[in-house]
């Protein structure tokens, strides 16, 4: 009786293997890249564009890519940098690169958490992907977001979104730098992603991408 039960269970397991393999093969990735175009990134914007293109080159064959940045809204000290989609769900590397080339630095108070929440909504609006990857190229400053970090992390987990980040925090002053590092480290860790903080005056692109280790399967 035990032998028959064992054989039956073994047969059921073997029959289920093709379904498991198909499910793994059908796993789909989708990427959203946030390029921080706020004023605090002005002196680093050249390397920001290079990093964005390097990421596009690495991931575009593995799933659709969307590019997001900020637009300035309002005037003076009360102006805000609000998130906007520049191009959505394409695997055309040339088109993505041209979109990146068209970006420029704008004013306004940064809303980083709001931007991530906005990206989550836009990526979620299109069915098909089983895992969504948000990639931030930013100094990590957030000044006037209305979205709360705890609420955002909960939404991201529910939506199977992992946050990866390249934190260009070198030019921030002490207190601001510590706050930015803490925010990016927490966001990426809690969502199953990773953050890289390049050191020194020169950013080694390939070393950063290798350490970031974006999902591409």
Where are these regions (language model features)?
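Bacterial N-terminal signal peptides that target proteins for export
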Residues: 1-9
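Von Willebrand factor
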Residues: 26-86, 112-119, 132-138
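Extracytoplasmic/secreted cell-surface and envelope-processing proteins
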Residues: 41-44, 75-80, 142-148, 172-176, ...
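Short beta-strand-loop
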Residues: 64-99, 115, 121-126, 145-147, ...
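VWA/integrin I-like adhesion module and closely mimicked acidic/polar interface patches used
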Residues: 140-186, 190
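C-terminal "exit" segments of structured domains
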Residues: 198-217
């Amino acid at each position: 009786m035990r032998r028959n039960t064992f054989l039956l269970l073994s047969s059921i397991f073997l029959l289920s293997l093709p379904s498991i393999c198909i499910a793994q093969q059908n796993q789909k990735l989708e990427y959203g890249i946030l390029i921080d175009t706020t004023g605090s990134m002005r002196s680093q914007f050249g390397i920001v564009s290079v990093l964005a293109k390097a990421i596009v080159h690495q991931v575009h064959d593995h799933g659709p890519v969307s590019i997001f940045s900020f637009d300035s809204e309002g005037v003076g000290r009360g102006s805000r940098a609000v998130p906007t989609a520049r191009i959505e769900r394409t695997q055309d590397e040339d088109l993505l690169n041209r979109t990146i080339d068209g970006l420029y630095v704008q004013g306004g108070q940064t809303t980083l958490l709001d931007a991530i929440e906005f990206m989550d909504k836009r990526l979620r609006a299109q069915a098909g992907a089983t895992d969504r990857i948000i990639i931030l190229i930013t100094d990590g400053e957030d000044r006037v977001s209305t979205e709360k970090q705890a609420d955002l992390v909960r939404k991201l987990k529910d939506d199977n979104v992992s946050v990866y980040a390249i934190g260009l925090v070198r030019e921030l002053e002490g207190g601001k730098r510590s706050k930015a590092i803490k925010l990016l480290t927490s966001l990426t860790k809690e969502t199953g992603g990773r953050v890289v903080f390049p050191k020194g005056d020169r950013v080694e692109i390939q070393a950063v991408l290798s350490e970031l280790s974006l999902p591409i399967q």
